[in-house]
Design a protein with these regions (language model features):
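A generic "folded-domain core" signal
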Residues: 1-135
Length: 135
């Protein structure tokens, strides 16, 4: 997904719309590269529905692994945002993996977990082409 600009190169991110088992869109994920030399090799923005239980955080697990928890940054009328820093080893896991499972907990049903599958097919080729974003 690219943003058109008047001048220079259009910044692009890897984008995936995640749907539930019934085909309803539930979450959006955008992944981008970060400048070299920082603790994070890449960044990701995950947008989930309002009424997500924010204190339970967002979990991302690749190919059935334990996964990592990430806090939510803010909510607006569109949804709740988690802005994530991915380490070089996280990026390598995405490149080697087949599926990243993203899990959230709904506020109205705190005893349940909603798990969405993010395909990692083509991640390596796509990641190598996305823009380096400075923010």
């Amino acid at each position: 997904q690219c943003i058109r600009t008047e001048q220079g190169e259009d910044p692009c991110t890897l984008y995936q719309l995640l749907s539930d088992d019934d085909g309803n869109p539930v979450a959006e994920v955008s992944v981008f590269r970060l400048p070299e030399g920082g603790r994070a090799a890449a960044g990701a923005t995950v947008i989930v529905p309002l009424e997500t239980l924010l204190t339970e955080q967002l979990r991302i697990a690749v190919d059935g692994g334990q996964g990592k928890l990430y806090p939510f940054s803010f909510c607006n009328p569109i949804g709740c945002y988690s802005r994530i820093g991915l380490t070089a080893s996280d990026v390598e896991a995405f490149k080697r993996g087949a599926v990243a499972r993203i899990s959230i907990v709904p506020f109205p049903a705190p005893d349940q977990t909603v798990t969405l599958d993010m395909s990692l097919s083509g991640f390596t080729a796509g990641f190598d082409k996305v823009s380096v974003l400075n923010n």
